[in-house]
Amino acid sequence: MSEWVAWHDGYAPGSALTRRLEAVQRMIRAALDALPQGPISVISMCAGDGRDLLGVLPGHPRHNDVRGLLVELDPDLAQRAREHAAGVSPSIEVVTGDASRTTPYTGFVPADIVLACGIFGNISDDDVHNTVANLSALCAPEATVIWTRGTFAPDLTPTIRAWFTEAGFAEVDFVAIPDTTVGVGANRLTTPPRSFEPDVRLFTFLPSEERPSRRGGR
């Protein structure tokens, strides 16, 4: 069992992971609700087993409007996501691939919603900044990016929020979940998106012992 499969198996009622999931899904619902009528495209980077998006779509009024691309490197998690997606919507594609580079998104962008959850706590501060600066290349105009990062010391979330502003995003929502070290944010693109280029490196996961998430939530 990989470390990422073990991490996903850590969800339990009332746990910090579950409360994070609830916050992410609330922001996904809000983003879907805010979009005009018509097709909706969603990208989930480092999608894991896909529960962030796949747990929202059933029963949501925009369910049939959504096409999704879930990118996950771990083959076991990608297969879990694929099996889950098959029972949710035929318009969800799961790719076993490297979400840290832009190549897997070729042919799918621009997206109306981009999920960058479980990433910022596992990469260097410089790579967080680089990712935020380049996320608009995956985005349609006025797209929403939903992201997570632990609020453990030293808390980088205020800086990340400022980086989103610098990158042309307005903050829609941010919550530091009480009694946890979990932060979840949503930002809407308010400036023209960057041009998409394939094979651009966004980030690199650090070795396990060097990851900021070792100090708390991801």
Which residue ranges define each predicted feature?
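Class I SAM-dependent methyltransferase Rossmann-like catalytic core
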Residues: 1-37
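Conserved class I S-adenosyl-L-methionine
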Residues: 36-48
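Conserved SAM-binding loop of SAM-dependent methyltransferases across substrates and taxa
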Residues: 49-63
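Conserved SAM/SAH-binding beta-strand->alpha-helix loop
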Residues: 74-76
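S-adenosyl-L-methionine
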Residues: 79-108
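A short SAM/SAH-binding and catalytic strip from SAM-dependent methyltransferases
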Residues: 111-127
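Conserved beta-strand signature within the Rossmann-like core of class I S-adenosyl-L-methionine
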Residues: 139-151
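SAM/dcSAM-binding transferase cores
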Residues: 173-218
